Structures are given as C-alpha cells and as structure tokens.
Amino acid sequence: MTKEEKTLKEYIFTSESVTEGHPDKMADQISDAILDYIIEHDPSAHVACETLVSNGFCVIAGELKTTAYAPMQEIVRRVVQEIGYTDATYGFDYRSAAVLNGIGEQSPDITQGVTLLDGEIGAGDQGLMFGYACRETDVLMPLPIYLAHLLTRRLAEVRKEGIIPYLRPDGKAQISVKYIGDKPVSVEAVVVSTQHAPEVSQEKIREDVIRDVIRAVIPAELMSEKTLFHINPTGKFVIGGPQGDAGLTGRKIIVDTYGGSCPHGGGAFSGKDPTKVDRSAAYACRHVAKNLVAAGVCDRVTIQIAYAIGISAPVSIMIDTHNTAIVEEKKIESCVKELFDLTPKGIIKSLDLLRPIYRKTAVYGHFGREEEGFTWELTNRVEDIKKYLKIN
C-alpha cells in the first residue's frame, strides 16, 4: 500500500445479482417477453404488464392500449421453458403451470396525457430517475455489480451447457469488494446460492462452483487466500423457483441498475413500453452519464432527471460529478441540456426504443451490456461533448 493510499478511506461495498430462474426475474422476463411481442406487432402500443409467479401458476395483469393480439399463454410457457423449468420435479414447469390473464385496457385519462396534440409524447407518469457511470470497469460500471452479473450469467451457462449438470435454474450471487478511496482493490467475499438436484453433496457443489463459476469469471488478481467463499450457506437448496418463493415483476430494481452504487428513483423497468419514463429516462440517464465519463469530462457521475405526468420536458436535471470533473458542473449541465433531447419522444427516437429488445434486458442488468440493442450503452456522443465543452 502506498503512502497516499494509507490516508484514503477504506471500505467494503457489496452488490448482488440473481439468475434467470429466480422467481422475480422469471416475472420480469415474462413481462418483457409480452412487451416485445406487442411492440413488434404494434410499435405505438402502450404497455404496462405485471407478472406474478407462484407455486404452480402465473398471473398476468396490467393495462394495454394496442391493436395487436398477444398469445399470453404461449408467451409465458415459452419463457418458462427457455429459462429451464422443464421438469415437474423442479416444482414448476412450463407444461403444467396454470396461466391466468387479467390484462385490461389503459385508462383514457392516462392516454390523453401521453398522446399530446402537438405530436409530442407526455411522460407516462411523474417520477425521478437516475443514471450513473464510473471508471471501475471497461464498460464504465461499478465493479461489484459487474462481477455479480458475471457470476449469475456463468451459473446459467454451466447449467445449460452441462458443465455442472445437476444445477437447477434458481440462484443468486453476491460480491463484496474492498475499496481504498474510490478504487476497488480486492474481492473480500463471494456468496453463491444455487438450486441443485437432491442427491448431490454440498461438498461437491462447493468444489464445482468455486472452480467452474467463481474462478472462471473473477480475475485471479482480485482474490487471495483470504477471500471468503460462501456456497449455499444454509445447506441444501433443492426447493427453489416459484415453488420456494413467489416472484413479482419489478422487485429486483437494484440488481437491474447499479447494485446500490447510486440512488434509485424507485420505478421498475420490465413490462413497460418506452413512453414510461421509469424505463426510457433511466436508459437516457445512463447514456448521458456513460458518454460524459467516456469523453473524459469526469471519472464518475450521477445524474437525476424528473418528470410530471403529461409534460414532455423534464422538470429538473441534476448532475453530480463527485468532485472528479475537469470543468464546472454548471457547464456540464448546459452541455447535457443542449446535446441530449430528454423528452420521451426524443429519448425514444435517439435510442431507437420502439423495438422488441426488452426481454434480454430483464436478466443480468440493464446497464454495462455490450450486446446488440443496448443503444443507451453506445458512446456515440463523446465527440459532441468534447466539442461543446472545448476539451481534448
């Protein structure tokens, strides 16, 4: 440790992720699969789709304004099958689960506020949204949530590819990272809870998970002999998925975003079309934040924007660079207002959000993803920002 590091604050920060077979994430994926189907057939649709999965059944509720017909039963069963609930012995399977449809029509009171006479789109609700970016990883995300998502994605991979064939779909991971100042330096603890077949010993599960999951994705230089591994710390984890816990859309909002590294406005994403600023404005905030950091304006930034229902322009914009900016924050705020159209219509157009891209966002985080379709992760405004702020 350098002399400078000794004077900096030391702390441990923890984030978690869950697998695609976690009941809350099952609900998110079902809601977004329904959204994808509807938006593919009717891009102007308004969708608010909520899902409940529990012991042997699934309930779909919410409001639609669309000309499309969505085969709800077929969509639900396909998602559950693709996740991996294919056997009745898992306690929930795509063939036998009951599917109840309680979808209704969107209130005309909401419709009139969203569809404005001048062609603009009013915010679908009031609310506040946050975006964040930092230099802890190549994708400009905090390290703890980034690593937690790598673990849960790997749990699904080793299950589906037969590397650890006795695993079942439900699972969680948690990472505790030590910081000195604002710099992550080591992984202090890893927690993995994974559903499994009943005949497998905990000793074998521990050995396989440490070797094929943890060490496969966490860089060796971040771990040491002092790193703690807690694998299924309660003992066996046979009963899982909707049989073990009910799942609801929108209950993993910190997993979906930054793992607790920045504030959250409280609005969930899944099942909502992009006129809902809970979703689209949070994506826009991330896009702005990532481009500011990528442009070298700051090393870390938190952005908040807020809306009133039926009003297109944000009622407020706040930028906090955590004392890492090379220009005044007021100038950065002016830059953002000038270069980024943060009306719902502007966000939808600039990020190309009227596409069936949402189910894949519903697991392993909405941010820090480099797959096709995650337009809010593009650093395509860097040169515009540099030019406006007159920085190299």
UniProtKB/Swiss-Prot annotation:
Q: Which InterPro entries match?
A: ADOMET_SYNTHASE_CS (IPR022631), S-AdoMet_synt_C (IPR022630), S-AdoMet_synt_central (IPR022629), S-AdoMet_synt_N (IPR022628), S-AdoMet_synthetase (IPR002133), S-AdoMet_synthetase_sfam (IPR022636)
Q: Which residues bind K(+)?
A: E50
Where it sits in the cell: the answer is: Cytoplasm
The reaction(s) catalysed by this protein are: L-methionine + ATP + H2O = S-adenosyl-L-methionine + phosphate + diphosphate
Biological process according to GO: one-carbon metabolic process; S-adenosylmethionine biosynthetic process
Molecular function GO terms recorded: ATP binding; magnesium ion binding; methionine adenosyltransferase activity
Cofactor binding notes:
Binds 2 divalent ions per subunit. Binds 1 potassium ion per subunit.
Q: What is its EC number?
A: 2.5.1.6
What this protein needs as a cofactor is:
Mg(2+); K(+)
Q: Where is this region: Flexible loop?
A: 106-116
**Which keywords annotate this record?**
ATP-binding, Cytoplasm, Magnesium, Metal-binding, Nucleotide-binding, One-carbon metabolism, Potassium, Transferase
Q: Give the similarity note.
A: Belongs to the AdoMet synthase family.
Oligomer and partners? Homotetramer; dimer of dimers.
Quote the function comment for this protein: Catalyzes the formation of S-adenosylmethionine (AdoMet) from methionine and ATP. The overall synthetic reaction is composed of two sequential steps, AdoMet formation and the subsequent tripolyphosphate hydrolysis which occurs prior to release of AdoMet from the enzyme.
Which NCBIfam families did the record assign? metK
The name under which this protein is listed is S-adenosylmethionine synthase
Q: Gene encoding this chain? A: metK
